[in-house]
Swiss-Prot record:
Family to which the UniProt record says this protein belongs: Belongs to the NrdR family.
Natural source organism: Oceanobacillus iheyensis (strain DSM 14371 / CIP 107618 / JCM 11309 / KCTC 3954 / HTE831)
NCBIfam families to which the protein is assigned, alphabetical: transcriptional regulator NrdR
Ranges annotated as unnamed zinc finger: 3-34
InterPro entries: ATP-cone_dom, NrdR-like_N, RNR_NrdR-like
Presence of keyword Repressor: yes
Cofactor annotation comment: Binds 1 zinc ion.
One GO-annotated biological process of the protein: negative regulation of DNA-templated transcription
Protein name, entry field: Transcriptional repressor NrdR
Occurrences of domain ATP-cone (ranges): 49-139
Example of a GO MF term: zinc ion binding
Function according to Swiss-Prot or TrEMBL: Negatively regulates transcription of bacterial ribonucleotide reductase nrd genes and operons by binding to NrdR-boxes.
Length: 157
């Protein structure tokens, strides 16, 4: 690795640690010529994951976009940012492990709703109302009834 200060090729690694749940390595380096210290990151190059939207438009998957939607759904709710991040990471992990380079926005939404329903019901309803684009109050009420029935069946077990 070249020193970013003097371009010398001889550097030594002072510290190396995994980051991003082991998907990357952060290395602290020092130039053997000038003593300049700098940080490098090593990441696995991932094949882009393409999302096929409802209208057929294709775009690259963005964890940040997913996070924004989750943060919006969990706004003013007792849901920690770490929980939101773990949901986004879990969804991305499932998508990448499936091995399909293209995924429908529908399947992403269903995964998010499944995970979010276990965390906070109000956030789940908020996300579902935007994702499923409820046309009227009866569809919205049907979704709420499903949540209530699911809760009752879980408590009965």
């Amino acid at each position: 690795m070249r020193c970013s200060n003097c371009q010398n090729k001889n550097t030594k690694v002072l510290d190396s640690r995994p980051i991003e749940e082991g998907r990357a390595i952060r290395r602290r380096r020092e130039c053997e010529r000038c003593g300049f210290r700098f940080t490098t990151f090593e990441r696995i190059e991932e094949v882009p994951l393409i999302v096929v939207k409802k209208d057929g438009v294709r775009q690259e998957f963005s964890r940040e976009k997913l996070m924004r939607g989750l943060i919006r759904a969990c706004e003013k709710r007792p849901v920690a940012l770490e929980t939101i991040e773990s949901i986004a990471l879990e969804v991305e992990k499932k998508l990448r492990n499936a091995g399909n380079p293209e995924v429908s926005s529908n399947s992403i939404g269903e995964m998010v709703m499944e995970l979010l329903s276990k965390v906070d019901e109000v956030s789940y309803v908020r996300f579902a109302s935007v994702y499923r684009q409820f046309k009227d109050i009866t569809v919205f009420l049907d979704e709420l009834k499903d949540i209530i029935n699911t809760d009752k069946s879980m408590k009965d077990k």
